[in-house]
A protein has these predicted regions:
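Conserved, mostly hydrophobic/aromatic
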Residues: 18, 58, 91, 126, ...
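Gly/Pro-rich active-site loop or hairpin
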Residues: 4, 102-106, 132-264, 278-286
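Surface-exposed, active-site-proximal loop segments in enzymatic domains
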Residues: 2-9, 31-49, 83, 138, ...
Length: 301
C-alpha cells in the first residue's frame, strides 16, 4: 500500500524541517516482524524483502544507519548486505542486555563480517549492558508493589555477586527464550529464587527477582575492542537525579571508553525508567535534559 514518505511532498516537508531545526537523522529503528501470521513464520526470502523495505525507507528518510533487533536471523542480515551497500545504509544489530560484545554470541556475527568483508553491518550497543546496579526506579516500584526489604536485599546481593564474579555471557541461539533461560540459570537464578522462597517471598518479590535479569554488566573495554564495528549507540538510562548522576548505568566509565576509542557516532538518549513510574508520573523531558547534560559533562571532562 502507498506510504506517505513515498511522496515528494512529504520528503520536501521533512527535509525542510530538518534544515530549519538543525537536525540530523541518526538511526532508523527497524523491527523484523517475521511472525505477523498466526500459522507460520515468514520464510527467509520474505524476511530479507522486509529488511530491504526498511533499508529503502531509511534511505528515503535520510538515515544512513538502521537498527535491527537481536532476534533478526543472521541469514537475513547477510542476505540484505548487498542492498544495504547499494542504498548506503548500515545495518546495526542492537547489543541489548543480557547480550554483550566480546562473547560467543557476538563471535558469530564477527565471523560473518570478516567472511563477507562488509562495511555495512556492525553493532549498536545499548548502554543497559553497563549497569553496575539494578535501577533504583525498579527497586522503588517493587516496594510499591509490596516487595519486602529482606527479599530486595537478596536480589540486590545476588546482582552484586554476579557483577563481582563476572556475568556468564549468553550464548548464540535462534531460540532466544532458551538462550535467555540458560543465561539466567548460569548466573544464579535458581539459588536466588530458592532464597526468596525461603524468605516467604510474594509476587512482588518474585517480580523484582526476575526483573534483575534484564540488566547486566559488561566491561567498557568491550567498546574499545570493537570500536571499528560500532557506529551508533542507544544511550539507555533509567533515572537521572538532581545532581545529574545515574545510579545504575556507569555513564562516566562508558563515555571515557568511547573517548579513548575515538568514537564519532551518536549517543541517542533512551529513557526507559519512565515505564516503572506510570503509577506516580514523571517529567520525561526533564529526565532527558539531565541525561544530555550528564553526557555532555562526561564528554568534556
Amino acid at each position: 500500500f502507498p506510504l506517505p514518505i513515498e511522496t515528494e511532498e512529504f520528503r520536501e516537508q521533512r527535509f525542510g524541517w530538518l534544515e530549519k531545526y538543525h537536525l540530523t537523522p541518526s538511526c532508523y529503528d527497524a523491527f523484523l516482524e517475521n511472525r505477523i501470521f498466526d500459522n507460520r513464520t515468514l520464510c527467509l526470502g520474505e524476511q530479507i524483502n522486509m529488511m530491504k523495505r526498511d533499508i529503502r525507507l531509511a534511505s528515503l528518510l535520510g538515515f544512513h544507519n538502521l537498527r535491527t533487533l537481536v532476534s533478526t536471523p543472521m541469514e537475513v542480515i547477510e542476505g540484505s548486505l548487498a542492498y544495504a551497500q547499494q542504498m548506503d545504509v548500515r545495518i546495526g544489530l542492537e547489543v541489548h542486555a543480557p547480550f554483550s560484545l566480546n562473547s560467543g554470541w557476538a563471535d558469530g556475527y564477527m565471523e560473518m563480517i570478516h567472511r563477507t568483508g562488509t562495511k555495512y553491518f556492525g553493532f549498536i550497543p545499548d548502554m543497559g549492558i553497563f549497569c553496575r546496579n539494578i535501577p533504583d526506579v525498579v527497586r522503588d516500584k517493587a516496594r510499591r508493589m509490596g516487595a519486602s526489604e529482606a527479599c530486595i536485599r537478596i536480589v540486590d546481593d545476588s546482582y552484586a555477586e554476579r557483577l563481582a564474579k563476572g556475568f556468564t555471557k549468553i550464548k548464540y541461539d535462534l531460540n532466544l527464550g532458551k538462550a535467555n533461560m540458560e543465561y539466567r540459570m548460569a548466573n544464579g537464578m535458581k539459588e536466588m529464587m530458592d532464597a526468596i522462597e525461603q524468605a516467604n517471598g510474594n509476587d512482588a518479590d518474585r517480580w523484582y527477582a526476575n526483573a534483575s535479569f534484564t540488566y547486566s554488566w559488561s566491561d567498557p573495554q568491550d567498546i574499545i575492542d570493537n570500536i571499528d564495528y560500532i557506529f551508533h549507540t542507544h544511550a539507555k538510562f533509567y533515572n537521572m537525579h538532581d545532581d545529574y548522576t545515574e545510579t545504575a548505568v556507569a555513564i562516566p566509565e562508558v563515555i571515557e571508553a568511547f573517548k579513548k576509542a575515538g568514537y564519532k557516532g551518536f549517543l541517542s538518549s533512551e529513557y526507559e525508567g519512565g515505564e516503572h513510574l506510570r503509577d506516580i508520573g514523571v517529567n520525561s523531558i526533564e529526565q532527558v535534559r539531565r541525561h544530555q547534560e550528564a553526557l555532555r559533562a562526561a564528554m568534556e571532562k
